[in-house]
Regions:
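C-terminal catalytic/substrate-binding lobe primarily of soluble NAD(P)-dependent oxidoreductases
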Residues: 103, 146-179
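Short, glycine/charged-enriched secondary-structure capping and boundary segments
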Residues: 7, 33-36, 169
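Secondary-structure boundary/capping motif
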Residues: 1, 98, 163-164
Length: 179
């Protein structure tokens, strides 16, 4: 979910630094009831707790978009919902920002070849509304915000399993075409 968002922002505004928070549906390695786990927070009941934990997403971005290596950090908050997550990225850029400029960049990107990967919504929806959405990121333009001239916040929904499965199908199609 973070990669398409970071790509659009970096291409359009040149990200200097940022911090992401993923509000993530609980996962299969979490406990249903309080139990044992090497991470004491993940040992707590997933269905009854907000669980702060680490994420590799911010570091992986540097592998996907080399110009962002070391510029993003992040955390995950596992929440008691079974599916659909939200990533929020607070970022500073070299170029001046406005809510309109940010939303326009995402809307233009979503109309191109990448429309299967990134979508935008202007509707005030909640997590369940994105269940089985095939896009990797759905930018919620109603949540875009700017402070000053170069600090912004973007929010993007994603159905982690379904979006990933759709990208794997895209790769299979591509491999079939080139073979």
């Amino acid at each position: 979910c973070l990669a398409p968002v970071a790509h659009v922002l970096n291409e359009s505004f040149e990200i200097e630094k940022g911090f992401m928070t993923t509000i993530h549906a609980f996962t299969s390695d979490q406990r249903i009831l309080d139990n044992s786990h090497k991470d004491p927070r993940r040992a707590r009941s997933a269905s009854q707790s907000i669980v702060p934990t680490s994420t590799g997403a911010s570091k992986a971005i540097g592998e996907i978009i080399p110009s962002l290596k070391g510029k993003l950090e992040g955390v995950a908050m596992r929440v008691p919902t079974p599916n659909v997550s939200l990533v929020e990225l607070v970022f500073c850029t070299k170029k001046d920002l406005s809510i309109e400029k940010i939303n326009s960049a995402f809307q233009n990107f979503s109309k191109g070849q990448e429309k299967k990967i990134l979508e935008t919504t202007q509707e005030k929806l909640v997590s369940i509304d994105f269940n089985h959405n095939p896009a990797s990121s759905i930018v919620d333009t109603t949540l875009t915000n700017v402070v000053g001239k170069n600090m912004g916040k973007i929010s993007a929904w994603y159905d982690n399993e379904w979006g990933f499965s759709n990208r794997m199908c895209d790769i299979a199609e591509y491999l079939h075409k080139i073979s």
